[in-house]
A protein has these predicted regions:
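Interfacial segments of multi-pass membrane proteins
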Residues: 48-52, 119-126
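Alpha-helical transmembrane segments of integral membrane proteins
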Residues: 89-101, 110-124, 143
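Alpha-helical transmembrane segments and their membrane-interface boundaries
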Residues: 1-94, 98, 106-107, 343-347, ...
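Non-transmembrane accessory domains of multi-pass membrane transporters/channels
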Residues: 134, 151-219, 234
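A cytosolic-side transmembrane-helix exit/cap motif
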Residues: 59-66, 107-117, 131-138, 182-185
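Membrane-water interface at loop-to-transmembrane-helix junctions
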Residues: 225-234
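Soluble C-terminal extramembrane regulatory/interaction domains of multi-pass membrane proteins
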Residues: 233-398
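Transmembrane alpha-helices and immediately adjacent membrane-cytoplasm interface residues
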Residues: 104, 126, 130, 134, ...
Length: 398
């Protein structure tokens, strides 16, 4: 119930856009163009603004309108010449799909061309309207849909920030459960965390699609041009967040292997895992501090037992979160990741340690640092590191 309400809350403006576009397209084709039955105008308008699509809708709308116009045109020509019938319908669908495949604009063009040809053959046979009018109606509907999207835009920033924050939340929860599982020798808890980590790909894909949709909106709508810089910044964090999720999965898998081999990492390495989880949650708060339905996970315990009393400090739960605070705490965490910490360690412990280092680099990039600057925050692992180190001095008074 609550998730349904949340979906409506995040999509209500898209519904309004689609309904308004359908009404405007029908009015324009009926009263301005004088078409007696402009069925395809509202159809193309609201289908092109599919309210449940997650991703760039302009390309989606273009493909649908192109497919509809193609199917209407092919259907009108074939059925006007050959008349209605089963084999005529088969031929119309065949020709429409072949042309759609030849154009090569994606599967939506092919499918919409075929469905429009079927519609012409069965519900709206030739002779009810002029052929060019129905093609024009489809084009008009698509253009009005894009116009409504440009003149009545929704603010893509909150949803884009929220979806990135959700992915980071899930990663933080997984790391917390892995750390607790290692501490308590609880293989089942780690296995459950690994399952959650493996299920995050859908959320990562959704994050990529929603931010791409937001970037498209600020490009199309003049009313959103002032937000282009913010969307570009969010678009830049998609890759490091994706990398972070992948690193969390590798870490969780290796933790399972460590338990199977009775090679539990040292308390210091487990502390690093907890620190990465808490730092990931801090970065999440930096992006979106608003409560969400996914605030309380269905797995594990709530991650309130953080590492702020350990060897390194993270931001207090109730304190303000700024980029400077998040970067400082990540650099302090990175400074503890000395290679000497895993001297003589097992392979599993070394892999977990290496994944923690990679996670810190990913989170620093999310906070705005370049990859080179993020890597420089780590203690070097060789005498001749590729990036000159700029490691935080742990003797400083934090």
């Amino acid at each position: 119930m609550l998730h349904g309400v949340e979906r409506v809350r995040t999509r209500w403006l898209l519904v309004v856009q689609a309904a308004l576009a359908a009404g405007l397209a029908y009015w324009f084709a009926l009263d301005v163009l004088g078409h007696p039955n402009p069925f395809f105008a509202p159809m193309a308008a609201f289908i092109g603004l599919n309210v449940m699509v997650e991703g760039p809708r302009l390309k989606f709308s273009f493909q649908l309108v192109l497919g509809a116009a193609l199917g209407v045109g092919v259907g009108d020509v074939i059925f006007s010449v050959l008349g209605p019938g089963i084999w005529q319908l088969t031929l119309g669908v065949l020709v429409a799909m072949i042309i759609g495949v030849f154009i090569g604009r994606g599967p939506l063009v092919v499918n919409q061309a075929a469905s429009s040809a079927v519609l012409i053959a069965t519900i709206m046979p030739p002779g009810t309207d002029l052929s060019y009018e129905r093609m024009l109606d489809a084009l008009v509907g698509g253009l009005i849909g894009v116009l409504v999207m440009a003149l009545l835009p929704r603010n893509p920033i909150p949803e884009s920030r929220r979806v990135v924050a959700t992915v980071l939340d899930m990663g933080a929860d997984v790391l917390y459960d892995v750390a607790r599982g290692l501490e308590n020798r609880d293989a089942e808890r780690i296995a459950a965390a690994l399952q959650v980590a493996r299920s995050t790909q859908r959320d990562v894909t959704q994050m990529d699609s929603i931010i791409a949709d937001g970037v498209e909106q600020v490009q199309v709508s003049p009313l959103m041009w002032h937000r282009r810089r913010h969307l570009r910044s969010l678009a830049r964090v998609v890759h490091p967040v994706d990398n972070a999720v992948r690193n969390v999965r590798v870490l969780a898998r290796r933790a399972i292997i460590a338990m199977q081999d009775s090679a539990v990492p040292s308390p210091e390495v487990i502390d690093l895992v907890k620190g990465c989880g808490q730092s990931m949650r801090t970065v999440r708060r930096l992006l979106d501090d608003a409560p969400s339905l996914a605030e309380i996970p269905e797995w594990g315990e709530l991650p309130h037992d953080d590492t702020k009393t350990g060897a390194f400090r993270v931001v207090e739960d109730d304190g303000p979160v700024t980029a400077e605070v998040a970067i400082r705490d990540l650099r302090i965490l990175a400074a503890h990741m000395r290679p000497a910490l895993v001297d003589g360690a097992t392979l599993s412990e070394m892999v977990i340690f290496a994944q923690c280092r990679s996670l810190v680099v990913d989170m620093l990039q999310v906070c705005g640092l370049s990859r080179k600057s993020a890597v420089a925050a780590l203690p070097p692992t060789t005498d001749r590191p590729g990036v000159p180190p700029e490691v935080w001095d742990l003797n400083e008074d934090d």
